[in-house]
């Protein structure tokens, strides 16, 4: 059952109201999820689950949310470059993404080539749909998505981010919601505070203390959301706290817990992590911001169904139900 339909808290619902709605996809997150789990094979005998699965994911969320606009954002070529220039070990140690099933006719290199082909191909499909798509060189999708949610154009809109990445919790507010598909959960400000004990305005600070193993950013020893939410419970406030204030609190507390000492003695680690994690000020050039803003303002909604059907025929799979996309 859709989480939209079974949420008890009305503040967390994707409200069917006068608010316009923009659906924003963290594209690589969705594509890799589809690529890994969708077993679809083309009539040519090649894996096409990345393409087919991502399109199905898109259709499902369009059905559920009925958006006025759809934006798909990819990590750009060398997208991690800015953060790697600060920390060369950023994102190191990640295991390569592999199919969770074996194809006896594909070598490791052929599987990699197929994955890259499917990604470029699904981008072509979306270019023929009424979708705004971004892939900016040397910029990560997280920064572009964060910037889009800040655009005055979307003031008063409900902004739904589709991603399993918890980094986006920091930019959630009354209008911006994070839908985490693998958890089948929708997070708004209230839910985030309830789950983590931390308000979105203080989320980057809290995560700078906790660290992020997926990005190879170690945190303070013994710090997790449960501990941070309990020991630094003021981070649940909507007021934005600074690293200085947290350090000062830890230095002046009467508690003898090692947790506070560890924070007070590791300011540089926390400051470093904050610089790497924060999305409040997206790491984008002025030119990149102008490009995104103007691309959205000048977008003309088109649906090239004939081209899509031809592509599907070439790629060896049958027609899906496109009407749900055409209506938007």
What kind of region is each of these model predictions?
Residues 4, 15-18:
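Short hydrophobic transmembrane-like helices used for membrane targeting/insertion
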Residues 7-10:
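Short hydrophobic targeting helices and cationic amphipathic motifs
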Residues 63-74, 89, 93-96, 102-103, ...:
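Non-catalytic nucleic-acid-binding/docking modules located in mid-to-C-terminal regions
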Residues 162:
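Acidic, His- and aromatic-enriched active-site or binding-groove loops in soluble protein domains
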């Amino acid at each position: 059952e859709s989480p939209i339909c079974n949420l008890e808290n009305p503040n967390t619902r994707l409200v069917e109201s006068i608010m316009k709605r923009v659906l924003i996809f963290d594209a690589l997150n969705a594509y890799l999820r589809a690529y890994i789990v969708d077993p679809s094979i083309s009539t040519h005998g090649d894996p096409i689950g990345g393409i087919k699965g991502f399109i199905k994911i898109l259709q499902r969320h369009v059905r559920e949310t009925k958006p006025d606009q759809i934006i798909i954002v990819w990590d750009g070529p060398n997208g991690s470059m800015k953060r790697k220039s600060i920390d060369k070990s950023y994102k190191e140690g990640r295991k390569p993404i592999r199919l969770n099933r074996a194809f006896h006719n594909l070598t490791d290199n052929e599987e990699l080539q197929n994955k890259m082909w499917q990604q470029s191909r699904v981008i072509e499909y979306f270019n023929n749909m009424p979708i705004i798509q971004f892939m900016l060189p040397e910029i990560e999708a997280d920064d572009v998505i964060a910037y889009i949610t800040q655009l005055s154009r979307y003031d008063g809109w409900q902004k739904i981010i589709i991603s399993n990445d918890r980094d986006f919790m920091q930019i959630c507010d009354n209008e911006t919601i994070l839908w985490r598909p693998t958890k089948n959960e929708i997070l708004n400000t209230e839910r985030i505070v309830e789950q983590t004990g931390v308000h979105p305005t203080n989320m980057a600070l809290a995560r700078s203390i906790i660290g992020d193993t997926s990005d190879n950013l170690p945190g303070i020893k013994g710090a997790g959301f449960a501990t941070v939410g309990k020991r630094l419970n003021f981070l649940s406030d909507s007021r934005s706290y600074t690293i200085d204030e947290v350090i000062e609190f830890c230095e002046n507390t009467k508690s003898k817990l090692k947790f506070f000492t560890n924070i007070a003695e590791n300011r540089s680690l926390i400051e470093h992590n904050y610089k790497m994690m924060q999305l409040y000020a997206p790491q984008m050039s002025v030119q990149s911001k102008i490009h995104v803003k103007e691309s959205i303002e000048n977008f003309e909604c088109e649906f090239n169904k004939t081209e899509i059907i031809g592509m599907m025929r070439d790629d060896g799979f049958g027609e899906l139900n496109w009407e749900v996309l055409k209506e938007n």
